[in-house]
Design a protein with these regions (language model features):
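Non-Sec secretion/translocation targeting segments of pathogen effectors
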Residues: 1, 224-234
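Tandem repeat scaffolds
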Residues: 4-222
């Protein structure tokens, strides 16, 4: 058991060292996919673990990640600037994966986890994230423009630039966050932060906790002003 554990640690360290190295394999080979229609007249390619592993080994074909249904897949590599627009990720894990310039436009991520990932210039506009968590990730820059996030947790992550303009955070939590140099949080004060079924006091507490975890001051709850004591009479 000790030998297995040591090998697992070595494999993890090897994979993590590759986070700064772009994935560059390409392929013109197309796979035979099953299709599924979750919306009328919008068929999606069904990607399982076997198809993903084969593509990762030989090189991802064009539009592999776009308009695709990923079902219980562990993703450990992606090409830079991958296009995941209009795709659906169900119970997937992004494990020690480099995401650089990846686009999740109008994408669904249900029950997913980003674990020990390096995330840079990645966009989630108009996407839905439910029960999707970020753990031990380095999030250098990401935008959740108009994203709908439900019960999503971000824990033990370092963050640089985040944009929450127009986002809706319902029952989301942030904890043990480290701010990177030159970091900036945008749009958080205008995001809709709610908790379904919670009291107004619980919602206020959660909102304050999110701002505090991200190192931001909530404009709705500015710090109490302290009156300066009067100076001595002259």
């Amino acid at each position: 058991k000790v030998a297995v554990l040591r090998q697992s640690i070595r494999d993890f360290q090897t994979q993590k060292a590759l986070l700064t190295v772009p994935y560059t394999r390409t392929s013109h080979k197309q796979f035979e996919y099953k299709t599924i229609e979750l919306e009328m007249d919008r068929p999606m390619k069904v990607i399982d673990q076997q198809i993903y592993d084969r593509a990762a080994k030989s090189g991802f074909p064009r539009n592999f990640f776009q308009e695709s249904y990923f079902d219980h897949v562990t993703l450990y590599c992606m090409p830079d600037n991958a296009n995941c627009n209009f795709s659906h990720f169900s119970d997937c894990s992004f494990h020690v994966c480099r995401l650089y310039g990846v686009k999740f436009w109008d994408t669904r991520l249900y029950g997913c986890e980003f674990h020990s990932c390096r995330i840079e210039f990645t966009l989630f506009p108009d996407s839905t994230l439910a029960n999707t968590h970020f753990r031990d990730c380095s999030i250098h820059s990401a935008a959740f423009l108009r994203s709908r996030m439900t019960r999503c947790n971000t824990v033990d992550c370092s963050v640089g630039r985040l944009n929450f303009n127009g986002a809706r955070l319902d029952g989301c939590t942030y904890g043990r966050i480290t701010r990177l140099p030159n970091s900036r949080i945008e749009g958080l004060e205008d995001a809709s932060i709610t908790m379904g079924g919670a009291t107004q006091e619980e919602v206020r507490y959660n909102r304050n906790a999110i701002f505090h975890a991200l190192g931001e001051q909530d404009p709705e709850h500015p710090p109490a002003s302290r009156d300066r004591p009067p100076g001595p009479e002259r």
